[in-house]
A protein has these predicted regions:
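Long, contiguous binding/interaction regions
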Residues: 1-81
Length: 81
């Protein structure tokens, strides 16, 4: 199946959602190229960037599931190729 490279940017404002988010990311681990998390303690949020190379349907589904978590905002950007 054809894959597309994408960057999923996640902002977590509710720490209680982190465990479920990590479980969703673990399920997609075979497609994840890399992950960077930045705790922004002054604002009480976490900023996470995920580089992924997966079928577009899987990336979209993952992004949607993460975005439905309470206190979590997500945006996905796809490479042109």
């Amino acid at each position: 199946m054809e894959t597309r490279v994408a960057c999923i940017t996640i902002i977590v404002e509710n720490a209680e959602s982190v465990e479920k988010m990590n479980s969703l990311l673990h399920d997609a681990a075979q497609y994840i190229i890399g992950r960077m998390g930045i705790p922004y303690r002054e604002k009480g949020i976490n900023i996470i960037s995920i580089a992924i190379d997966a079928p577009q349907d899987l990336t979209s589904e993952l992004s949607g599931k993460i975005g439905r978590l309470e206190g979590v905002t997500v945006k996905t950007t796809y490479a042109n190729h």
